[in-house]
Amino acid sequence: MSARRRNQREDRESRRGQFLSADRNAAAPHYTPDGHVPRIQAAEAAAERGAPIVGLVFDRGVLLGARYDPMGGEPLPAFLGKNTSNLRGGKILRLGPRLALAGAGLMGDFAAVGRHMRGRRFSSTRAAVDYLGSLFWEHTVRHDTRILGTFVLMGSTLDGDARLFQFSPSGSIHEYVACVRGRASRTVNKRLAEDYRRLSLRRAESVALEALGQPEAYELFTVKT
């Protein structure tokens, strides 16, 4: 083999080795023990430790609810025991009469979600779901962003039908008729799945407060058809 051909072969092998190395390096953050998947699991665990939120589809829309708990011995907020759907900076974000979000977990991350969603006009439920889903996916798969440590429930009647969606730190999206996220959510979700029936608003409010643990301070908002 001539020196020229030998050099060309060595160059090809060198480039092939570089590509394989690049592939391995790209995969490593996702699948190594200290990589991306454990970070997703940690973000979901952090979100599950938050005070619970609930979403219920009822006969005329979607009801979103959120519980407020004092932290570090602080007193309960001034809206004790009231329906506080007008609360600024709360756990329920109204994006108009037909679209709203509720967040559990890291409230700074939920606020960041709100900044992206606020002020945008969505022509349909699908458009709103696609936009918020893309935001979660971007934070989940990119290496230069932090995974969002929040579960978000979206209630929408933009198309005339009442629909409820959950967005998780992993980037997954699920549609439900009843869902709880935050502390004790697994137990409550099982009970809701067994007992759920299409509800009136009054009954939905009662079920929501029960799912939230009959809190002293809470927030409710109705997305009506």
Report residues per predicted region:
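Long, low-complexity N-terminal extensions
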Residues: S2-T225
